[in-house]
Amino acid sequence: MSHEWLISASETMRSIGNGEGLRDKGAVVANNDGEFNEGDTNREEDSSTIFSFDFDEEIVMCIDFSGGKLGCSILDYHTKTLKAFDQDYVVNKTTISSHDLIDDADMSSNDISLLLGLLIMEANPTVCLVPARLEDWIFDYIKTKCDEINCRLELQPIKRFKKWDLLQSLQLRGHDNQTILNDILSNSKFTTTVTLGTVGCILANHEQLGEYNDSTASSNMVTGRLVQNAFEDVIHGIRYIDIRDRMVLDENTISALHIFPTAHKLGHDKMMRNGFFSVFELFNQVSSDYARRILKSWLINPLTNKKRIETRYSIIRTLLDKQNAIIFSDLSQSIKRCPDAFGFINQLRSGKSTLGTWSKVASFLEKGIAIFQLVSSLKLGSDEANILHDIKNKVDISALKECLRKVETVIDFDTSRDTKTLTINTGVDNRLDECRNIYNHLEGILLDVARETQIFLLNTMPQEDCKTTKSLEKLVNAVYIPQLGYLVTISVLMEPLLDGIPNLQWEEIFRSSENIYFKNGRVLELDETYGDIYGAISDFEIEILFSLQEQILRRKTQLTAYNILLSELEILLSFAQVSAERNYAEPQLVEDECILEIINGRHALYETFLDNYIPNSTMIDGGLFSELSWCEQNKGRIIVVTGANASGKSVYLTQNGLIVYLAQIGCFVPAERARIGIADKILTRIRTQETVYKTQSSFLLDSQQMAKSLSLATEKSLILIDEYGKGTDILDGPSLFGSIMLNMSKSEKCPRIIACTHFHELFNENVLTENIKGIKHYCTDILISQKYNLLETAHVGEDHESEGITFLFKVKEGISKQSFGIYCAKVCGLSRDIVERAEELSRMINRGDDVVQQCGNLTEKEMREFQKNQEIVKKFLSWDLDLETTTTSENLRLKLKNFLR
């Protein structure tokens, strides 16, 4: 007998955590996605604009600048963390720079722009809130930065920045959280006035979103809680935004040092596959999005606190210890693809959990336990506490094991993966097991009902109707439909025959194009006996999962804290892995010395593209930072590098910058040895930031970068300058460069400077000579063959293009007064005629000839050509065209050809 199963056993063992499946069955699932009216990114509000807002993923940033004070706070909905300045950032012009090269008006704007750019880049907000009274130049800068990262900029009324009472009503768990909150509130009238206003604005903004979300009747099916104004649901912790112990990098430096990727790998050769275009790519061996966010934060914010930096060194040193080699390898494997605890906890809280969610919970717990055991096996030093000590001593491993035991006891992951639905283990709940047993035997029960119905119809229908009726097995069935219960189905072909049955007492429920669905006495008995078995199973499973979910959420603070530790450990494992693979060395940091000593340093990125990279050393010893008379003590803080084109000057420049940078993010460095005075800023004039929307000339953009670097630099800074002065007059460019070098060499608070230049005229007597105090001269070494004349630019034969000069890519002390630009142009394929003419002009200049006069003299070849052309002109002028009126055009053409012979 055939049965029409609308809901079969395989189809109904569904994932009750899946919202769509439950909606299909008539359940109501909370949808926390809301929409709200906010203004666009113009200075005028547009209340008709509607944006969606994800309460689990948004990052809201609020910035205010008032009375010379900058305040900032950030609410991360993903991690449920509120971050704020521990005190307002005060713009103090007297401490910005000791140099008199920049107007005071530009100092504060550069300082604020630099800080705002770093904050926005690090936070990567999705929404940025600013007050309507914000100064135009700050608003324009923030808008530009927000546009770059596709962040929505929203103007807020001033009254929202006075909602301090919202922060006072905030209740946070944990001693640290409450301490920070009380500290911010207690200093609200003194040091955190502007920052506290930004926090109030963020809370007021969330309050408005909650009210809108509540008005749309969005609810949470599992937790039964409305979003409303419950800040405790979105803020689980509060942290300081620390801007004091960080090295400052501006966007020019980040671009020049290739901190983040700006290009994609092209090609399939081994060199391209193994090479890295950015520091982020070099260390991006992490698997979770949250770990990637922390890595980005670390890269944007190198440290200046020696103790914190050396704590990271100690972890790398421990991981690379030969005694820990096997454990290090196992740790690197175990931590891969470790799920993000913030993600699955948000899904559990919002009622959006699926099989994937619970799989991540189990995977996180399994990997977390395995990593704890591996870390506990490491041979740790007795130095101060670090992440490894925190994992070993502060993580409650018994709680993790208990959570894992409960999850594995409740959920049958093997069956769930096979059926692609969430399945509860047998034995968890006797009531659920009993309902499942009934459900699994429904096919037999319904088969019996269908047979009984067929027999009933055969016995009650008139004899003549029975003869005309086809096989009842194909026309009569029994089915179960959730919520409707048990039904008898009859083919619509049999409807006329049913009219002949007296006192049938069947109730039609609904019909389709092929069947009619009835309730009769037999199926009513099933309704009474078994009820809505599918709904009962769903209810029991929801109840079980809700109980499990609550048990996991009670541990959310411990799980998220451990998640942060694991993410930071994964980054340090990446640092250690790169350091081991590429033979990096642990640098020595000093706090009070203006020193940059690098022995056999290498470029962290360029060496990934080369089989053999040629190392170079650097030595800057500028005495103590506090020494105002450093230049009188035979110390040097400035290096000027000269040399041939394409000889490696720019690479050497960025190589030193990257080594200092890597040292202060807490990683080992690509060098044999390094001793580095901690830098508070790395500032650059290397790459001209030209874009379509910037209409300034390249020299103007270069000068803006140079001015910004000089205005922000302190005695602890590092400035990298690559060929400043090009792109303008041949006198103005060298004059500006030389003036900057001389002025800085006399400054009491001169930063460390490494500069490259091709202005060889500066190294003549009484300008940038080797005798000037405070300046050291380096040059790139080259090997010149005997065929190459140092006094005259040699001609490179067509068959010997690669002969003459060999670039050694080695830096040594001294001054190079030749750039060999013509040779480089020849090797690069520039036209031979152009190169030969350039060589000729170069020889004239080197001999001291008058180039203008020489260019006015004609060669013998040119004189012969001139005389020939002169004869042609004379012949043409003596030609009497009046005599040619009857000459055909063809004959005229022939005569003209004769003139030109």
Curated annotation (Swiss-Prot):
InterPro entries, sorted: DNA_mismatch_repair_Msh2, DNA_mismatch_repair_MutS_C, DNA_mismatch_repair_MutS_core, DNA_mismatch_repair_MutS_sf, MutS, P-loop_NTPase
GO MF term set: ATP binding; ATP-dependent DNA damage sensor activity; mismatched DNA binding
Keywords: ATP-binding, DNA damage, DNA repair, DNA-binding, Nucleotide-binding
Signal peptide stretch: none
Biological process terms in GO annotation: chiasma assembly; mismatch repair; reciprocal meiotic recombination
Binding of ATP, residues: 643-650
Record field: transmembrane: none
One annotated Gene Ontology cellular component of this protein: nuclear chromosome
One Pfam family, short name: MutS_V
Note from the entry: Two distinct classes of crossovers have been demonstrated in budding yeast. Class I is MSH4/MSH5 dependent and exhibits crossover interference. Class II is MUS81/MMS4 dependent and exhibits no interference.
PANTHER family per record: DNA MISMATCH REPAIR PROTEIN MUTS FAMILY MEMBER, MUTS PROTEIN HOMOLOG 5
Subunit text: Heterooligomer of MSH4 and MSH5.
Family per similarity comment: Belongs to the DNA mismatch repair MutS family.
Role noted for this protein: Involved in meiotic recombination. Facilitate crossovers between homologs during meiosis.
Protein name: MutS protein homolog 5
Upper classification of the organism: Eukaryota, Fungi, Dikarya, Ascomycota, Saccharomycotina
